[in-house]
């Protein structure tokens, strides 16, 4: 059965979508069966996977509200090697529509139940807020991967995110845990990055991934060509870092569960 991970942070611009696309492609490159779900109405993970959000007949929105089935909404990322449930601006209406539905916070979990055995990993790109869409992602997930820049404001907001994850685990999804924290856009020449990284190691210990994602121009360029960095420039530092992250993620599945800590 697939491991389901939400890629989440309530702060924008920390590398959630970049991580979702490139981790999905890296896992697929190691022969894992991967599904990426774009739950952000901006649809950046959809476009970055090579699927035009403006040309969709059905999207994850239609799936959530029961207007299509999984097969109708599913796409394939040619460059990424993974399946995709795409998003477009229709998803902005989900906040209002889902509130009027029964079991509104479990719509995604229920939709995925029939296909979890078809995949090894399901990755969910969340919007940068604790919205009904993010709530659906967290209720459907086994764990949360938290990408974050090593800056003080990001560290400050992390405590709120951890608290929210714990509340959701207590009330709606007892299986939910923090899978790992990922340092993104990292520049070891900056003392601030190094200082915050040291604080993360102190507070979160083994929950912090050893892999660090560097600032890398190829990671920034690849989405405009509708492909992950691994397809755009497989020897780039960014592509190699996400391959390393995929390997670390797979190895972690064999370890005992980790207990969430607060900052």
UniProtKB/Swiss-Prot annotation:
Signal peptide: none annotated. Pfam families: AAA_31. It comes from the Bacteria. Gene3D superfamilies: P-loop containing nucleotide triphosphate hydrolases. SUPFAM superfamilies: P-loop containing nucleoside triphosphate hydrolases. CDD domains: ParAB_family. To B.subtilis soj. This is Uncharacterized protein PP_0002. The lineage of its organism: Bacteria, Pseudomonadati, Pseudomonadota, Gammaproteobacteria, Pseudomonadales.
């Amino acid at each position: 059965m697939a491991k389901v991970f939400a890629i989440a942070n309530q702060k924008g611009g920390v590398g959630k979508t970049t991580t979702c696309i490139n981790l999905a492609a890296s896992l697929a490159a190691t022969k894992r069966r991967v599904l990426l779900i774009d739950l952000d109405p901006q649809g950046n993970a959809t476009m970055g996977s090579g699927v035009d959000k403006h040309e969709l007949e059905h999207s994850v929105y239609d799936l959530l509200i029961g207007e299509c089935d999984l097969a109708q909404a599913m796409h394939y990322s040619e460059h990424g090697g993974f399946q995709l449930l795409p998003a477009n601006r229709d998803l902005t209406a989900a906040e209002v529509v889902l509130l009027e539905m029964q079991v509104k916070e479990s719509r995604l979990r229920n939709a995925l139940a029939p296909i979890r055995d078809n995949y090894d990993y399901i990755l969910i790109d969340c919007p940068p807020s604790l919205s009904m869409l993010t709530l659906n992602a967290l209720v459907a997930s086994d764990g949360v991967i938290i990408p974050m820049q090593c800056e003080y404001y990001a560290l400050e907001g992390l405590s709120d995110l951890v608290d929210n994850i714990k509340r959701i685990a207590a009330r709606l999804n007892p299986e939910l845990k923090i899978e790992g924290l990922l340092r993104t856009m990292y520049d070891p020449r900056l003392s601030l990055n190094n200082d915050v990284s040291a604080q993360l190691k102190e507070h979160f210990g083994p929950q912090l991934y050893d892999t660090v994602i560097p600032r890398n121009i190829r990671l920034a360029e690849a989405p405009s060509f509708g492909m992950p960095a691994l397809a755009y420039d497989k020897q780039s530092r960014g592509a190699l870092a996400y391959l390393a992250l995929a390997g670390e993620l797979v190895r972690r599945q064999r370890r005992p569960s980790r207990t969430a800590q607060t900052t």
